[in-house]
Amino acid sequence: VLIGDPITTCLSPSVYDIICNLGFQLRENCDINSIVTQNGEVCWKTITDCVSYTESDQGLDYWGSVRLLGPVCEAVHSHFLSLTKGQFEIRYAPWFQWTSFPELFPEIFDALESLQSPAISLSLMKLTSCLERALGDVFLLIGKECPFLLRDLLASEELAQVFGQSVMNVLKVFVGSPCGLNLRNVLWHGFASPEEVPPKYCSMMMLLTAGLGQLLKSYLQKTKLTLAHRSFITPTNLEDLIVFPDVTYEVLSVLEEAMTKSAFILKIMLPYWEVALVKFKSHRFADCAILLLTQLETGLRNVFATLNRCPQRLLTAEILAKHLNDGKINQLPLFLGEPAMEFLWDFLNHQEGPRIRDHLSHGEINLHEFSKETTNQLLAFSVVLLLRFVDEGLLSVFKEKASVELLISLAEGYSSRCHPVFQLKKQVLSCEESIRVWALLPFPKELTWEAVRLEDNSETNACHSLITKMTDELYHHMPEDHCVLKDLDHLPTETWPQLLHELCSTPVRTLFCPRIVLEVLVVLRSIGKQCHRVSGQVTIASELRHRQWVERTLRSRQRQNYLRMWSSIRLLSPVLSLILFLITLELVNVHAVCGKNAHEYQQYLKFVKSILQYTENLVAYTSYEKNKWNETINLTHTVLLKIWTFSEKKQMLIHLAKKSTSKVLMKT
């Protein structure tokens, strides 16, 4: 797929020029003492005077600014290289304390001293993410909602109020605009090779960070405000994403060889992969993940541009989208296959996924606490991906290793763990397990007869009759190759767990779900959430009343309420199980909603929202504050009639989906 002339840069000519050439055009020497004092205090005027503006003074002249700032950056870089680490820490360490990660900066100093290009690029990535997080904290001294994008943050009036507009303009030149050096985006999106990032820009960004700390100190003293750091976030649903085993030394040796043989890796980017491996072996898991994420994007962008025959898009492509800008189908998902695309979407894009790249690049994760398990998953996936781009002979040799064969097998069987479909399945099974606990709730034997007598009323009996009819109806819509009871006149309660587990094991297409499907999933998930809340409230209320009964602290009214509650529970258990069954069947057939016209869709949405309304009312009525157990019976009867009426119209998704004639009898 990737046979062609070697790629020498992933930067456009103009971006290459501004980063690699423009800041070196002026050869004049700049006196370091005019930039920073012996005590490490930044002389901002020298720096801000280098920023150029357009003739109308309405905007920044980015090219002119980069050109003038070049000698300043050179002087700063030489200055840092002339210091010992001890001197650096004495002069500058206090001015990094305003960031939430001050210990990063001595590491960056070490990277600059090492003169190793990949380490300097990695340092610059970590510096920009740390700076963005710290600037967000400063923004919140005045503002209320911190902008998500760094460029919007740098353009905010709040930061200009703290640091001054001329200082913010300096930052815009380095990291705040695609018209400037744009160092953050160029590195975090994997465009710049190690040799294309001048180390002097890393040195300059470090000095600017120290200078911002000095300006902030003055501002805080003047305003009597206190800077508070937001807590780091913990990425969500990571436990669901652990599908690959720990990477072994055997797998690492395969990766080391594959890196030099796989067409997926651009030769100019190979040093990043080599450093990523070193970082993994030395337990620097966040560093490894940062490098892997950026280089996976680089490699995938190259495959994207090749498959879609748009080499110019190597510079800009949005690689995970379904369509290209011209409306044509993106060939990358077809080539990689759904499992690989699902993995990428889970880790990078899904709102309920860990969104590792986003959180790392915005400085929201504590790098020291970044988990080995997460990096393991990225590394294992990278191995499988690289092997897609080696020749058949070498692939056969690698596949002889059991550990490699296992990784490939697991990757090929991957399905989304962060898509709303998976989350709804997880929710249903958790709720079913919660409802199952009701059968174990204690109830005084001496009250059993009274509770049974309360159940014997026409409305409760009508509810049970409707539940039986609907269970029979729904059972006929089990998907192909799933079980059907021999005797549909009676559904034993012990079959519900097996039934729901089987349904939740049914594959549902998740990649590039249409908006209409996602809208339905939102409502179905809301129903599941409310069912779970009801289940939890019932358990707590029952345990409380039983404890009061045992301790003989139940008053007469509370005793009657306890009986009504128990009577209600015996109805709510099959009702909630039925609703879980219904929403899971609808989930399995959710793509059938695309076959509805606008009117039919609105009617369907109205129907599922009526079930949601019922579950929300149940939450209210079963709460400790309201305790309206009798009213739940009338609510339940009403919603069961609605469900049955709508089912009779054959407008549920189970009615629209194609019926399979293949059925398997379940042993009863």
Swiss-Prot record:
InterPro entries linked: DUF4209 (IPR025209), ERMARD (IPR039635)
Name of the protein this chain belongs to: Endoplasmic reticulum membrane-associated RNA degradation protein
Keyword Metal-binding among UniProt keywords: no
Bilayer disposition of the protein: Multi-pass membrane protein
Pfam family, one: DUF4209
Compartment(s): Endoplasmic reticulum membrane
A single cellular component GO annotation: endoplasmic reticulum membrane
Stated role: May play a role in neuronal migration during embryonic development.
Chain segments annotated as transmembrane: 378-398, 575-595
Keyword annotations of the record: Developmental protein, Endoplasmic reticulum, Membrane, Transmembrane, Transmembrane helix
Lineage: Eukaryota, Metazoa, Chordata, Craniata, Vertebrata
Annotated S-S bridges: none
